[in-house]
Amino acid sequence: TIAPLNFRVTDDGVEAVDVVIAGTKGKPVRLNGRSVDIPAKQWHELLESNKGDSIEVKVSVRQGKKWKEYRPFPIYVSPFPIDYGLVYRLLAPGYEVYSKMGIYERELSTFRQTPLFENTQVTAACINCHAFNRTEPTPSSVHVRGGHGATVIDTGDRLEFLDTKADGQLSACVYPYWHPSGEYIAYSVNKTNQAFHLGGKKPIEVFDQASDVVVYHPRSHRILTTPLLSTASFETFPAFSPDGRTLYFCSAEQKEMPVRYKDVKYSLCSIAFHPEDGTFGDRIDTLISARTLDKSISFPKPSFDGKYLMFTLSDYGNFSIWHKEADLWLLDLKTGAYRNL
């Protein structure tokens, strides 16, 4: 049920393109033109006819009045439908200046994109960190930075605009992750900075001067924390386990920043959480040590069945978006083994 996989042939001197997409069943799709825009109706009918099998794509191009056929390639058609949609932030690439940005919903069986929240609704605002409780539209959390900034929480029956910077807290709430019950939401609080390199392949470095992890209870409007998550170390990227009794996060030893930014490497850690009363365990467990890998872990995401945890691995730091060497890894939570994806 995925949307048509349109593509273009980018070779030089291409005058025409001929494409045939066919399976063992159903009516083949034949297209001509410089770009391949597959009609949605024909595409979905072909996929429906070949569920659990493969379709084959044959591409021919005309260059210099001669036709050349590329090697055909298969596309496997899953017997299961694709998820309904995705939600993401969309903005033009840049470092400091931005104009229009927002949080958008994309229907995966089509190319339909719907704005959920745009910064045109809030003057000169940066709309960024957002989270839903698993695959449900509510509850949700969106962070808005700027003169009219707030943490926006939709509990399903009310919409709240909150100043989440509590007394003595490093910042307002930043990276979010909902408790499966919807009764709590974990956040990191970060003093984040960016710097530009004078040379080299990485133009920019984003780093924390300090960071902690807290848990917010929307019903009582209380920030919950423990000294174990508010140390001199950098704690960030919280994520609850599917049963809601473990809080995963990343932690790195404090270094002089930005001088020693390459020495900051985050381990994957966890602490027990008791949803009955919103309290924490009395120790931190290290699941994967940065010292062992000599790498840095960021963005931990546990699977909903509780069997696995996916994370990003990079050379250093926690803002792996700017790191070309960053890659996804998968941790087996039962065996402790992890592998590159």
Indicate residue ranges for each PLM-predicted region.
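A short loop-to-beta-strand structural motif that recurs across blades of beta-propeller domains
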Residues: 102, 150-152, 212-214, 267-269, ...
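Asp-box/WD-like beta-propeller blade repeats and closely related beta-sheet repeat scaffolds
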Residues: 71-85, 93, 158-212, 223-236
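Short, conserved, GDST-rich strand-edge loop motifs in beta-rich repeat architectures
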Residues: 84-97, 187-209, 249-266, 311-325
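Multi-bladed beta-propeller domains
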Residues: 1, 26-42, 109-125, 154-172, ...
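Contiguous beta-strand segments within globular domains
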Residues: 1-13
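Conserved, compact domain cores that house catalytic/ligand-binding motifs in diverse enzymes
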Residues: 85-162, 168-169
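Conserved beta-propeller blade repeats
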Residues: 122-141, 166-188, 229-247, 257, ...
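Short, aromatic- and glycine-rich surface loops/edge beta-strands on solvent-exposed regions
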Residues: 49-64
